[in-house]
Amino acid sequence: MNPLKVLTISSVSIWLGAMAFFSIFVAPAAFTVLDRESAGRLVTTVFPRYYLFGASLGVVGLIGVIGQFFGSGGRQALWGTLALLLLMLGLTLYAMLVLEPQIQSTRLALRSAGIAPGSGVAEAQAFARLHRISVILNGVTLLAGLALIGLEAIRSRG
């Protein structure tokens, strides 16, 4: 198998594994074991690193796809893989650079005003909306990664 293809598949697979582990195990466990405030602080601390890790792996995967294209003299256009990887990377960068700072500022406003995140107050509703968007983007990124791995598996069968 082409080493650049291995690089792309490996980086996306590691990314998916990290996403699944954090989303399915770490975050829910934090909110089960810790009080809401402590769990929120833990997740707040992890998320910037989570997004940076994903974006870094996305760039590595992108290097693999671009390398495959140029290594084949342009004969091997991996448009589906490229589109899915760019979608994953774009959503992750948006979450990291735009959404996460908004969530943090909303969380700080809630904390400083003494408002509980689950209450019906406007700030709490804003936080819930931003959190919902974050969960959706994470889910779409995960599904795009699974589709990318599936597409590459189909292409390998040739």
Residue positions per predicted region:
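Polytopic transmembrane helical bundles with strong interfacial aromatic enrichment
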Residues: 1-158
